[in-house]
């Protein structure tokens, strides 16, 4: 109610004026210029931090001049923007506000963003967004609405927008559907954070590939403690790249996340022990790091890298000459922390030429940080040396940090040695750090390398053992 005791400077608005879609107009009409502070941002959707307030049950009012980072309603409303997934059995799931029907089982074959309705849309929708420095207007045709089941209908946003190669400096992109403006990030699953998100969801092969493609641009936008949280299993071989991928073609090569010393990986990736399957891992042509991650200076937790029904390889592309390179399945080099991670089924291949140094390991190429509870099964580590220095180990090519409670199963082979120096070991090709409570079962083959069952007698080892002379690998599921 209202009356003589209203606070000075306030104007009464009844329920109808503040509910549903009318609230965007009401905020402009009744608040007028109440928010005039310049904060360097664009138009915004305000974020209601007060529990129990009426506005929390509806879309947030649109305010101008305030930087905005979170766009999702507190309560789901039909006829709004949602994140959606398509599964191998033909079913759909979506996430919007407090409504979620996405699954943690089965295989995701496609994902994206779109408008969801509880009945068939009555008319076509006009969509406006910026792309390539120009304003684009497109139409979502009601005749193309997809029956998602459960009484919901989906009109997907244009693929050119969902798979844009542009990275917004505000992290979120703006899209206007009819008279409503939304902010979202098409490269990942939706975030509910009011500011630059402290946690970003990774759910599909497209999203993990986007992290590889655009990490260099996203890295300076995110706080150092930002967590990239994997929320379900990811399978590259089962994803429908033709209909949902960036280029419409199957991903045959993925570069490391944090692919150089200029832009290393500095954040937190938590795999949640969900498998990541069938990723074709290659360095950039002439790059110094190869693996799922390149140079890790952040934290990798609970990452399980597998190959599915066939073996895949980690490859160093280009000619390695007069420089140092690092190759491993999980990471090329670790200067940060790795905890409770596993890799299985990835062969590692590289060749070293004049004046170069190559560190190769089944798990990481080189460790200068801390690794605890790491495991790897490598069908083959294969390399050659031509007047170069080559250091190979079933677990890591070199270690100057700490490795504990870890093990490796591998088949390590040097094809050719011409000059230079080659060290071949079951666990670590070089060790000037510390290795604790770890073991390996490794077959070593070399025409003339310095060969060690576990690691060279340098550095420190404690409670470690090795088994050599056979061929070993995991079979079946990987359990952490």
What are these regions (language model features)?
Residues 74-189, 212:
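Short, surface-exposed linear motifs at loops/turns and structural transition points
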Residues 1-79, 177-180, 184-480:
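Predominantly extracellular beta-rich ligand-binding scaffolds that present long acidic/polar faces
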